[in-house]
Amino acid sequence: MQHTSRDHLSYNFKTTAPHPPVEWKISDGLVEYPEALRYMQKRVENIYAKIAHEQVWLLEHPSLYTAGTSANKNDLLIPHVFPVYEAGRGGEFTYHGPGQRIAYIMLDLKRRKQDIRAFISALEQWIIQTLAQFNIKGERREDRIGVWVVRPDRPSIISGIPAEDKIAAIGIRVRKWISFHGISINVDTDLTHYSGIVPCGITNHGVTSLLDLGLPITIHDVDNALKKAFEQIFGPTIDVS
């Protein structure tokens, strides 16, 4: 296991004072990306105005690509296969689509910890603890945000370094110390759809999913694992429709 400078950061992102539980919202079906973006932006405004609570929103999108603020246009290899959206989040190009669980995280970091680097580390830990419930060892990397799995079953791309694939991506934005956008975990995603981009600008490593790792796990199973791990790191939740 590789160690990173983020390993020492605290994974406790619970509120520093008593606070209502985080709303836990799950949407069935596919949510169009512009609709999700509008929802998040409005929610951030309302959290800042103290007329809405923090929320985690679990959903799936139809197949599409999003470009983060660091995206290189040359990394969009096949521009017309799926819609492409400017996301406004950090990061580069990524794919979203059916079979991928997205969790948009709208939290007030002023009530928790005003440290974006530590927040990203906590999000990574959330994913790592989620995957551990399925006996998958997820790892972070010093120079790559997200969560990775080592693939000893595959040939090395870089001599002397075991192959590894990305199973979960992180891309956030923080406005007035309120986070939005979030994480995505590949459950049974069609991995061929990543061929239209250079995912997150990384060429030396691939992508994987729970199904690709030999685990035919349902989205519902992943949701339960996400909730358990989230509450360990960020505090209690309450289900909302």
Curated annotation (Swiss-Prot):
PANTHER family: LIPOYLTRANSFERASE 2, MITOCHONDRIAL-RELATED, OCTANOYLTRANSFERASE. The lineage of its organism: Bacteria, Pseudomonadati, Pseudomonadota, Alphaproteobacteria, Hyphomicrobiales. Its EC number is 2.3.1.181. HAMAP family: LipB (MF_00013). It catalyses: octanoyl-[ACP] + L-lysyl-[protein] = N(6)-octanoyl-L-lysyl-[protein] + holo-[ACP] + H(+). The keyword Acyltransferase applies. Belongs to the LipB family. Pathway: Protein modification; protein lipoylation via endogenous pathway; protein N(6)-(lipoyl)lysine from octanoyl-[acyl-carrier-protein]: step 1/2. One of its GO terms (biological process) is protein modification process. Keywords: Acyltransferase, Cytoplasm, Transferase. One of its GO terms (cellular component) is cytoplasm. The record marks K166 as: Lowers pKa of active site Cys. Substrate binds at R89, G90, G91, E92, F93, T94, Y95, H96, A169, I170, G171, G182, I183, S184. InterPro entries: aa-tRNA-synth_II/BPL/LPL (IPR045864), BPL_LPL_catalytic (IPR004143), Octanoyltransferase (IPR000544), Octanoyltransferase_CS (IPR020605). NCBIfam families: lipB, PRK14341.1, PRK14345.1. Residues 50-238 form the BPL/LPL catalytic domain. It comes from Bartonella bacilliformis (strain ATCC 35685 / KC583 / Herrer 020/F12,63). This is Octanoyltransferase. Catalyzes the transfer of endogenously produced octanoic acid from octanoyl-acyl-carrier-protein onto the lipoyl domains of lipoate-dependent enzymes. Lipoyl-ACP can also act as a substrate although octanoyl-ACP is likely to be the physiological substrate. It holds the Pfam family LplA-B_cat. One of its GO terms (molecular function) is lipoyl(octanoyl) transferase activity.
